[in-house]
Amino acid sequence: MPQETEQFCRDVNRMSAYLALDDFGGSGPGPEVLSGLDVIALLGNQVIATLKAACELMRRSLGATLVLSGGAGHSTPLLYDNLRLSSYGGLVRQGLVRETMAEAEMYTAVAQAAFHIPAGSILIESRSRNSAENARFSLQILKDANRRQRTILVLQDPTMQRRSMITWAREAEIAGSDARVLSHAVFVPAVEPGLDGMPRFPAGQVQGTWTMERFLALILGEVRRLRDDENGYGPRGRSFLPHVEIPEPVIESYKRVLASRLNAVAVR
């Protein structure tokens, strides 16, 4: 296997592991955590595993509120296509999930029809277009509905999990929320060398996720946003985020992947 591909995959996986922030060491929330959850918040994304996990955790919780957040954006048609090709595709054929829906509305259709989660346990936030609005509008609808929110579990596309948590913390501070907020990355995305010398997803990460082009664009875009320089979202850039101290090995991996011919070939 070409050494270049092996190095490329190691670098991609290092960035991915950093971005997929998880407070549970990969094992997921246990019964003790679930029994104390007030809110499970799923932020709009295209990865079907995040929707499935949020609904399954909701069913195991004791009276939590499920917040489904997501308007219409870049991920919306990708979410629809992934749902259409998934085990929930029957809901598309029945017209319960439609291409014109906001992400939160698609989520709601699946949560109710496939997981039998009562409508009264769900709050739908269908206006947000970015991670800041996901957090801001979710906190607002919880307040408007007078729902208890002492402990909140947040799920997002694993590539966006770290930035979403940083953004949520900032929006919570602005809103005066002192809730305990937990992060759950449903899985850590990975790539491996293929027989053709190109990076590929392991078999279990092919369906309901991303194209390789989309995945590489996401992780490179996330690290770029987190970097506190003129191109990032930190104080030295667009000031959307506080300063983030990214580990140097992650920065080095980012630079190598950005410069690699494999990145250019993979996204063609």
Regions found by a protein language model. Give the residues of each.
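A structural signal for short, hydrophobic/glycine-enriched beta-strand patches
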Residues: 1-208, 264-268
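Generic secondary-structure transition motif, activating predominantly at the C-termini of alpha-helices
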Residues: 13-19, 23, 220-231, 258, ...
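A conserved mid-domain beta-alpha-beta active-site/ligand-binding segment of alpha/beta enzyme cores
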Residues: 190-256
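C-terminal accessory domains and tails appended to enzymatic cores
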Residues: 253-268
